[in-house]
């Protein structure tokens, strides 16, 4: 008889009172599954719990939270030796849940938890930025970064992903271009940009398809740059309706480097990183993740 897997669930503290998740955990425990639960309260907790999972010889580590929680857990898994690395599972509990939504992970707690424990384990890529920073979904820079990092927590809680668009409309005074240079294999671009997106996944900011062709197991990243040739009208048209825009520059690359005369801030799935230079590279098949058969981000 095959043993039931050992699972450690890392729960974002903001969702610690979720009754639906508590009920789903109880049901799976009654079915014989070993489920340890740990709650994060500050940055660094997830890394410590991943290390604990390895000591427990856990088969799965579940990130229960939003995109930031998923990324923090994935980054902690990526630096562990492959021989002892647990498989990542995802239970979406955040505001936007962009990565989980793109992967078509169920929003219903019992179904998501069951998938995270028993679903198909698939090797997926993650991206490394400079030394020691990672993202599983997307890095965004420019106006989009300011919006996603400055949208008030109360607005996000009340309105969900629509809060990002609403806050963007409130803060058009922040709309200014940033000069930078981007290069990678057989690619070079320089100029003024409003938004830069580097995607392992496809969407960010509450459902905006910034990198619509990205895949999470192809060993490549999708780059999308909105140049500042024309400001507000074309930006809104391209980024909020998904229509084609001549000021959009796209490329598919295994790595790229971005340099700027002034500090730029990128949002790495919720983690802000400020620098004048960024090297972003894909780490192919860096971790395994339990995903549904219909996941559209797989080759």
UniProtKB/Swiss-Prot annotation:
<dbReference type="InterPro" id="IPR050187">
    <property type="entry name" value="Lipid_Phosphate_FormReg"/>
</dbReference>
<protein>
    <recommendedName>
        <fullName>Probable lipid kinase YegS-like</fullName>
        <ecNumber>2.7.1.-</ecNumber>
    </recommendedName>
</protein>
<feature type="domain" description="DAGKc">
    <location>
        <begin position="2"/>
        <end position="133"/>
    </location>
</feature>
<dbReference type="GO" id="GO:0005886">
    <property type="term" value="C:plasma membrane"/>
</dbReference>
<feature type="binding site">
    <location>
        <begin position="66"/>
        <end position="72"/>
    </location>
    <ligand>
        <name>ATP</name>
    </ligand>
</feature>
<dbReference type="InterPro" id="IPR005218">
    <property type="entry name" value="Diacylglycerol/lipid_kinase"/>
</dbReference>
<dbReference type="GO" id="GO:0001727">
    <property type="term" value="F:lipid kinase activity"/>
</dbReference>
<feature type="binding site">
    <location>
        <position position="40"/>
    </location>
    <ligand>
        <name>ATP</name>
    </ligand>
</feature>
<keyword id="KW-0963">Cytoplasm</keyword>
<dbReference type="GO" id="GO:0008654">
    <property type="term" value="P:phospholipid biosynthetic process"/>
</dbReference>
<keyword id="KW-0808">Transferase</keyword>
<keyword id="KW-0443">Lipid metabolism</keyword>
<keyword id="KW-0444">Lipid biosynthesis</keyword>
<keyword id="KW-0547">Nucleotide-binding</keyword>
<feature type="binding site">
    <location>
        <position position="218"/>
    </location>
    <ligand>
        <name>Mg(2+)</name>
    </ligand>
</feature>
<keyword id="KW-0479">Metal-binding</keyword>
<dbReference type="InterPro" id="IPR016064">
    <property type="entry name" value="NAD/diacylglycerol_kinase_sf"/>
</dbReference>
<keyword id="KW-1208">Phospholipid metabolism</keyword>
<keyword id="KW-0594">Phospholipid biosynthesis</keyword>
<dbReference type="InterPro" id="IPR045540">
    <property type="entry name" value="YegS/DAGK_C"/>
</dbReference>
<keyword id="KW-0067">ATP-binding</keyword>
<dbReference type="InterPro" id="IPR001206">
    <property type="entry name" value="Diacylglycerol_kinase_cat_dom"/>
</dbReference>
<feature type="binding site">
    <location>
        <position position="95"/>
    </location>
    <ligand>
        <name>ATP</name>
    </ligand>
</feature>
<feature type="binding site">
    <location>
        <position position="215"/>
    </location>
    <ligand>
        <name>Mg(2+)</name>
    </ligand>
</feature>
<feature type="binding site">
    <location>
        <position position="220"/>
    </location>
    <ligand>
        <name>Mg(2+)</name>
    </ligand>
</feature>
<comment type="function">
    <text>Probably phosphorylates lipids; the in vivo substrate is unknown.</text>
</comment>
<dbReference type="InterPro" id="IPR022433">
    <property type="entry name" value="Lip_kinase_YegS"/>
</dbReference>
<keyword id="KW-0460">Magnesium</keyword>
<dbReference type="Pfam" id="PF19279">
    <property type="entry name" value="YegS_C"/>
</dbReference>
<dbReference type="GO" id="GO:0005524">
    <property type="term" value="F:ATP binding"/>
</dbReference>
<keyword id="KW-0418">Kinase</keyword>
<comment type="similarity">
    <text>Belongs to the diacylglycerol/lipid kinase family. YegS lipid kinase subfamily.</text>
</comment>
<dbReference type="GO" id="GO:0000287">
    <property type="term" value="F:magnesium ion binding"/>
</dbReference>
<dbReference type="GO" id="GO:0005737">
    <property type="term" value="C:cytoplasm"/>
</dbReference>
<dbReference type="InterPro" id="IPR017438">
    <property type="entry name" value="ATP-NAD_kinase_N"/>
</dbReference>
<feature type="active site" description="Proton acceptor">
    <location>
        <position position="271"/>
    </location>
</feature>
<dbReference type="Pfam" id="PF00781">
    <property type="entry name" value="DAGK_cat"/>
</dbReference>
């Amino acid at each position: 008889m095959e043993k039931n897997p050992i699972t450690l669930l890392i729960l974002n503290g903001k969702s610690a009172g979720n009754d639906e998740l508590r009920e789903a955990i109880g049901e799976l425990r009654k079915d014989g599954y070993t489920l340890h639960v740990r709650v994060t309260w500050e940055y660094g907790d997830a890394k410590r719990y991943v290390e604990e999972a390895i000591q427990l010889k856990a088969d799965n580590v579940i990130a229960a939270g939003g995109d930031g929680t998923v990324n923090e857990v994935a980054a902690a898994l990526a630096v562990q030796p492959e021989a002892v690395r647990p498989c990542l599972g995802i239970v979406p509990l955040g505001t936007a849940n962009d990565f989980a939504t793109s992967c078509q992970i169920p929003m219903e707690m019992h179904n998501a938890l069951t998938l995270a424990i028993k679903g198909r384990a698939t090797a997926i890529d993650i991206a490394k930025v400079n030394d020691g920073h990672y993202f599983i979904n997307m890095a965004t820079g420019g106006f989009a970064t300011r919006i996603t990092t400055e949208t008030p927590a109360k607005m996000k809680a009340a309105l969900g992903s629509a809060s990002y668009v609403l806050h963007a409309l409130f803060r058009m005074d922040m709309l200014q271009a940033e000069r930078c240079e981007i290069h990678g294999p057989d690619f070079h671009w320089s100029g003024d940009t409003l938004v830069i997106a580097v995607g392992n996944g496809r969407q960010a900011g509450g459902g905006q398809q910034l990198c619509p062709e990205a895949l999470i197991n192809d060993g490549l990243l999708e780059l999308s740059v909105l140049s500042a040739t024309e400001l507000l009208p074309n930006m809104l048209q391209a980024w909020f309706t998904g229509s084609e825009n001549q000021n959009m520059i796209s490329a598919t690359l295994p790595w790229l480097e971005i340099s700027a005369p002034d500090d730029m801030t990128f949002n790495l799935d919720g983690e802000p990183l400020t620098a004048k230079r960024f090297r972003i590279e894909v780490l192919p098949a860096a971790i395994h993740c339990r995903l549904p058969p219909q996941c559209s981000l797989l080759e």
